[in-house]
Structure formats: C-alpha cells, structure tokens
From Swiss-Prot:
Region (G3): 81-84
Single GO MF annotation: guanosine tetraphosphate binding
Chief location: cytoplasm
G5: annotated segments: 174-176
Protein name: Elongation factor Tu 2
HAMAP family: EF_Tu_B
G2 as annotated region, ranges: 60-64
NCBIfam families recorded: EF-Tu (TIGR00485), PRK00049.1 (NF000766), PRK12735.1 (NF009372), PRK12736.1 (NF009373), small_GTP (TIGR00231)
CDD domains cross-referenced by the UniProt entry: EF_Tu, EFTU_II, EFTU_III
Binding residue positions for GTP: 19-26, 81-85, 136-139
Top-level EC class as recorded in UniProt: hydrolase
Length: 394
C-alpha cells in the first residue's frame, strides 16, 4: 500500500475532544479514526497509540497531547486529545492546539460532571467557537427517558455558558461498540462526522484576516527610512498601503513604501512570512519592539482585561510559593514584556502553583489586543504562567 499524497485541496479544520475524565474522550477519538478510515479511507489509530500522548512545549509549559488526523469526503481534520484534565486546561489556555470546534463527550451513564462544566467554561473563555455533543456509553442505558434527561441537562449547561444549547447537535452513541465494529454504533460515528462537516463552518484563513505584524526589530536605512521586521501574524500588507503602529505609545499612521524578504524586494508580505517593512515618515525612535503594525482601525491598544490564567506548578519550573493580590509580574505579549497588576476574584486570597484562575489584569502600557490573545506571565524572564485575554475591559 503506497502512502497517500497529502491533499491540500480540502479545507483543513482543527477539532478536539473535551469532557470529564473517563467519559470516553480517547475511545471516541480512536473510534472516529477507525470508522472513518474504514468508510472513507485513511489510517486508523488504536486507543493505546492515542493514550500515551507525547510531551510538547507551548509557551514554556509542558503539555501532553495526542494529535490524530482523519478525513471526511469534504474535509481534512486535525484532532487533539489530552490524557489528563490538567493537560486540557493548559492546552486551552496556551492555545497550543487552537480548536475551530470541540466535541464535548458526556457519558450517558453519569451525565454532566464537574470537569464537563469546567471544559465548557474554558471553551467559552478561550474562544472555542462551536461545540458538538457526543453522548457516550448509550449502549449501557436502556431507559430512553434517562437519555433525554441527560441531553436536556447538557443543553442547559451549554446555554448557561452562552453556547446555543438548544441548537447544538447531540449524537447518542457508544465509542466502544463502534470500535468493536457494531454497525448501528458505527453509524453514530458517521453521524458525528456529518455534524463536524456541517455545523462547524470552514475557518477563516490567517491570510484573509486584517493585516497584523508584531514588531521584533527596528532599524534605519540611510536615505530610505525606517524598517521594522517581524513575522506577519495575519493578513497581507501591500506596498503603498496605509498602516497603523499600535501599542505602548499613541497610535500613529504611516504608509508601507517597501516590503523585503531575504534582501529581495516584494510587492506584498503575507501571513507566515518573515519580512521587513519600510515605513514613510517614521523616525527610528518613534517605534519599538512590542508594538504592532496593523491595518488601520483593525486593532486597538488596551491596558485592562479579564483573563483566564494557568500558573505553573513547582515541578513545571514555576513558582514554589503562592502569590497574593498586589502581585506585579511581567505579561509577555507577542514580542515584549509589560508589567501589570492583578485583581483576583472575590473570595480568592491567594493563587497556588498549578492552579487555573480568572483574573483582571491592568498593564502599565497599552498593548494592541483582542479577545483571544495569548500571553505568558514571567518573573525576570522566567515563565511562571500562561494566559488568554477572555474579555477586553479598557
């Protein structure tokens, strides 16, 4: 059997399984790869291949994550599954595996449990845009009314966290029976795949979003002007277009008079490329690392935001002691550290290493940000936590 060529023609969508421990997330992941491979071609992955997840580093944090891939006739999916609850928390907060949609696995035998709730809340905070529910272990429940009750509970829970609970697709299945090849349960996996295809819209590609380039370096070229360098995060910048310099200082407008890559002149710079952008009428000292170059009006500078944060444990190289209100670490956004103060939720006196917590941060300088922006928390250059902007306040 020859290796299939990787087809770039299909839309690529990132998904993952979330939900309470032992509700069958990994079994479902194995079942999806197995049933879809059998039906549409591709390679199946066994439970134990997925379960011993390799370690990865994201923003200085070690996370165990398994990545599998599968295809439906219309799409290619990259699917992430994590072995432990802490790995999910870290994964979602660091954005190590950004999800275009998530499959929430709920055992019909248990109904929603504490981690079910926590994963839904995290999904809301970190901006997982779509959820599909897979009610697992339905082969173990004979009572149709009980199944309806569990479905109702899950829908209410999703609605409580601002997901459209009444409209979300719910598939009642059995991952284990599907893995064992029982036709009626295999059909439920095909039904789930159908919802992945139809309910999760095709994600907007980075190159189609408004232009943004985090500035890494600035230098002046005599007779030509000031050049900023960095990797284009999203969108396209064309020679002759207006851009804004946002963050740290007052926002300033300029015009891109040249784009270069590897000393060659280009007419545009695109998402993913490392480029130098020549700016008209800007002095070397007017601009610094940590600012961004962006399409005018597309992003604003902010200082205060609500965030969802994971604090590294001592074993992960984090702090050895808790911190209290009045804690003033550095917050690392894209290319620079900014000092900030924190406000803990009511009734929370201290935060222990290994905790995840919601907190309001106020920075000493404004930074260009939108909801969903990831950051690291650092003390003297050492990462002690990771976070995501849940909601910009001011």
């Amino acid at each position: 059997m020859s290796k299939e060529k990787f087809e770039r023609t299909k839309p690529h969508v990132n998904v993952g399984t979330i939900g309470h421990v032992d509700h069958g997330k990994t079994t479902l992941t194995a079942a999806i790869t197995t049933v879809l491979a059998k039906t549409y071609g591709g390679s199946a992955r066994a439970f134990d291949q997925i379960d011993n997840a390799p370690e990865e580093k994201a923003r200085g944090i070690t996370i165990n994550t398994s990545h599998v891939e599968y295809d439906t006739p219309s799409r290619h999916y990259a699917h992430v599954d994590c072995p432990g609850h802490a790995d999910y928390v870290k994964n979602m907060i660091t954005g190590a595996a950004q999800m275009d949609g998530a499959i929430l696995v709920v055992a019909a035998t248990d109904g929603p449990m504490p981690q079910t709730r926590e994963h839904i809340l995290l999904g809301r905070q970190v901006g997982v845009p779509y959820m599909i529910v897979f009610m697992n272990k339905c082969d173990m429940v004979d009572d149709e009314e009980l199944l309806e009750l569990v479905e109702m509970e899950v829908r209410e829970l999703l609605s409580a966290y601002d997901f459209p609970g009444d409209d979300i697709p719910v598939v009642k299945g059995s991952a284990l029976k599907a893995l064992e090849g029982v036709k009626e349960w295999e059909d439920k996996i095909i039904e789930l795949a159908g919802y992945l295809d139809t309910y999760i819209p095709e994600p907007e590609r980075a190159v189609d979003k408004p232009f943004l380039l985090p500035i890494e370096d600035v230098f002046s070229i005599s007779g030509r002007g000031t050049v900023v360098t960095g990797r284009v995060e999203r969108g396209i910048v064309k020679v002759g277009e207006e851009v804004e310099i946002v963050g740290i200082k007052d926002t300033v407008k300029s015009t891109c008079t040249g784009v270069e890559m590897f000393r060659k002149l280009l007419d545009e710079g695109r998402a993913g490329e490392n480029v130098g952008v020549l700016l008209r009428g800007i002095k070397r000292e007017d601009i610094e690392r940590g600012q961004v170059l962006a399409k005018p009006g597309s992003i604003k500078p902010h200082t205060t935001f609500e965030s969802e944060v994971y604090i590294l444990s001592k074993d992960e190289g984090g702090r050895h002691t808790p911190f209290f209100k009045g804690y003033r670490p550095q917050f690392y956004f894209r290319t620079t550290d900014v000092t900030g103060t924190i406000e803990l939720p009511e009734g929370v006196e201290m935060v222990m290493p290994g905790d995840n917590i919601n907190m309001v941060v106020t920075l000493i300088h404004p930074i260009a940000m939108d909801d969903g922006l990831r950051f690291a928390i650092r003390e003297g250059g050492r990462t002690v936590g990771a976070g995501v902007v849940a909601k910009v306040i001011a």
